[in-house]
Amino acid sequence: MSAMVSALTQVVSARSQTEAEGAHSSSSSAGHKRGWLGIDSAPIPSSFARVDSSHNPIEESMSKAFPEEAREKKRRYRGVRQRPWGKWAAEIRDPHRAARVWLGTFDTAEAAARAYDEAALRFRGNKAKLNFPEDVRILPPPPPLLRSPADTVANKAEEDLINYWSYTKLLQSSGQRSFLERGQEESSNIFEHSPMEQPLPPSSSGPSSSNFPAPSLPNT
């Protein structure tokens, strides 16, 4: 684009210079002729004045027609690159994972630069280097995550299943403990209420007659 503009500028300047020189030569010859005829030479009209090379109508028309493109070419943005087909790509380096994060492709360099600024604020906070520091504002907190009805039902069923499993384990553990405690109590009661066997007296070496009654004889 700049090469085309400079080429057109040179062509216009050369043409203007040629026209001005031709007008100057014709006016000088006319002046000589008037002097030879005795007529005073008139001043050169202002329309034939030399065109100022600093005034370039082509560049002015191009800047008026494409003001945004002219500004974008003058300024380079951080984290923004132009694709060969004209789009603008934005990317940023993640300081936590040490990897580049793709932010997308945009129609203008300014939009890509603003996307980079938002990502830089998320990654680095107040230490971020921005393209538009004058437009920094406190970002609102992200909206709460809305769950779909299917996710809500699935989470509720999973929670109920976990609660039921925990309750079942609690019942099993309490039932085993009560059974053992009941068995221990019954065993202790049996030992407490059962009569203890008395030890037998020591026996003598031989049978004693006093211990046995005398047999009775039948009457005759």
From Swiss-Prot:
First and last residue of the signal peptide: none
A biological-process GO annotation: positive regulation of DNA-templated transcription
DNA-binding region positions on the chain: 76-133
Compartment(s) of residence: Nucleus
Transferase as UniProt keyword: no
CDD domains reported in the protein's UniProt record: AP2
Feature: compositional bias, Basic and acidic residues: 57-72
Cellular component terms per the entry's GO annotation: nucleus
Protein name, per record: Ethylene-responsive transcription factor ERF110
The organism of origin for this protein: Arabidopsis thaliana
Source lineage: Eukaryota, Viridiplantae, Streptophyta, Embryophyta, Tracheophyta
